[in-house]
């Protein structure tokens, strides 16, 4: 099995790593001040900020930005801003939620699919929005390197993967900017042994025991699904022009990711609530009938009530989203996705707040195997400043 690979990494060879590493491009998409403050902090120092396209700026000077990003990548390579290393990296990220431990490795895009009902070893958790892929493809197709914010999850309840790790020398150890906490990266000395431990999690008999299905599943995508989908599209477009021999070893076939145990205590799963803004709130609530034996809390103008909600949470969210879309199409309004009970409570004076139950970590893999992709915005993993920061890179040309 070659789904996993020890990558040839490009590690930053710069003096100020706190200026180099920046948050995932899909965070703080409504917070221009965050990105302005980050740019001011970075200043003229070498930074991954110059190699990414923050989504808050999508649609603004797109062609020029992408051309500048690609040129910056080539310039950094020419100036020796990276040092090469073949190996896996043990990443220990400390945030307000605790210390989360991950492993940076490369995965075969032939073993990944974002299509619902797929049976690949690596699958998306949420429905992929087709229109969000092309901008990422446009950035990637001419880029010489990739910097990942993709986080894959694996189901290792007894911790066999991390217990197999032999920690080597420290590669980096620094504070992250903008309240991102602290990160330490160490070389893993026994990469092949660690990959073997990962492969064992997708053993057919083990999957049957854990999920009641023989469908072999190793990773689900926790963060960065649309970026991984863009990498897949770029690879599918490229491979048709390659010989069979070239396809097996081309660097674009493998995507750089960080893999984290879903049972990591510092990995928080939280529901994403809905806030519906409409001038007909009473009508919305009157016809909000989802059925089921569970409950969801509805708050309107500070008043709270409850509606029936299916015990199958993804099924309930799918039904709710369908109702919201139909209501807005007929009566007008808009929907926003809110993280945190307190924020929803505060905002419910501006609309109808629907507080959803959280899915359990223990159920995620089983839900993906049995039902395919979950509805969009089903859950989130921690706060925005806990997301992955760009540090390592890998050649894709």
Give the ranges of each region predicted by the language model.
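Active-site beta-strand/loop microenvironment that shapes enzyme catalytic pockets
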Residues: 200-242
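C-terminal catalytic or substrate-handling cores of phosphate/nucleotide-
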Residues: 275-378
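Catalytic or ion-translocation cores adjacent to nucleophile or general acid/base/metal-coordination motifs
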Residues: 225-286
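Compact, glycine/acidic-enriched structural inserts
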Residues: 167-188, 264, 269-289
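Short beta-strand segments
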Residues: 153, 221-222, 258, 355-357
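Portal/gating segments that form or line small-molecule/metal binding sites
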Residues: 152, 176-201, 205
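A residue-level signal for conserved active-site and pocket-lining positions in enzyme catalytic cores
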Residues: 152, 224, 348
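N-terminal extension/subdomain marker
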Residues: 1-180, 206-208, 216, 359-397
């Amino acid at each position: 099995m070659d789904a996993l690979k020890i990558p040839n990494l490009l590690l930053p060879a710069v003096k100020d790593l706190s200026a180099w590493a920046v948050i995932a491009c899909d965070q703080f998409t409504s917070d221009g001040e965050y990105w302005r403050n980050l740019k001011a902090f970075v200043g003229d120092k070498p930074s991954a900020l110059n190699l990414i396209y923050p989504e808050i700026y999508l649609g603004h000077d797109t062609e020029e930005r992408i051309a500048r990003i690609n040129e910056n990548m080539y310039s950094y390579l020419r100036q020796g801003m990276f040092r090469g290393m073949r190996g896996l990296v043990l990443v220990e990220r400390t945030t307000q939620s605790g210390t989360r431990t991950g492993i940076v490795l490369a995965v075969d895009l032939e073993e990944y699919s974002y299509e619902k009902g797929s049976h690949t070893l690596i699958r998306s958790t949420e429905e992929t929005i087709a229109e969000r892929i092309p901008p990422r493809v446009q950035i990637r197709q001419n880029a010489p390197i990739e910097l990942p914010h993709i986080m894959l999850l694996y189901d290792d309840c007894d911790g066999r993967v991390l217990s197999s790790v032999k920690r080597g020398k420290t590669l980096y150890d620094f504070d992250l900017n903008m309240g991102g906490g602290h990160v330490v990266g160490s070389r893993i000395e026994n990469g092949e042994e660690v990959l073997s431990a990962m492969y064992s999690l997708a053993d057919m008999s083990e999957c049957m025991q854990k999920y009641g299905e023989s469908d072999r599943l190793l990773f689900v995508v926790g963060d960065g699904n649309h970026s991984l989908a863009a990498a897949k599209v770029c690879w599918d477009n490229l491979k048709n022009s390659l010989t069979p021999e070239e396809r097996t070893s081309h660097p674009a076939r493998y995507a750089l990711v960080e893999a984290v145990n879903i049972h990591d205590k510092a990995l928080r799963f939280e529901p994403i609530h809905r806030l519906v803004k409409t001038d007909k709130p009473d009508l919305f609530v009157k016809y909000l009938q989802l059925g089921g034996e569970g409950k969801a809390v509805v708050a309107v103008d500070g008043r709270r009530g409850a509606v029936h909600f299916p015990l199958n949470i993804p099924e309930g969210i799918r039904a709710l989203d369908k109702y919201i879309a139909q209501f807005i199409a007929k009566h007008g309004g808009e929907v926003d996705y809110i993280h945190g009970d307190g924020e929803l409570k505060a905002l419910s004076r501006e609309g109808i707040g629907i507080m959803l139950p959280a899915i359990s970590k223990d159920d995620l893999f089983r839900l993906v195997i049995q039902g395919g992709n979950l509805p969009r915005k089903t859950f989130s993993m921690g706060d925005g400043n806990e997301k992955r920061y760009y540090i390592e890179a890998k050649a894709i040309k």
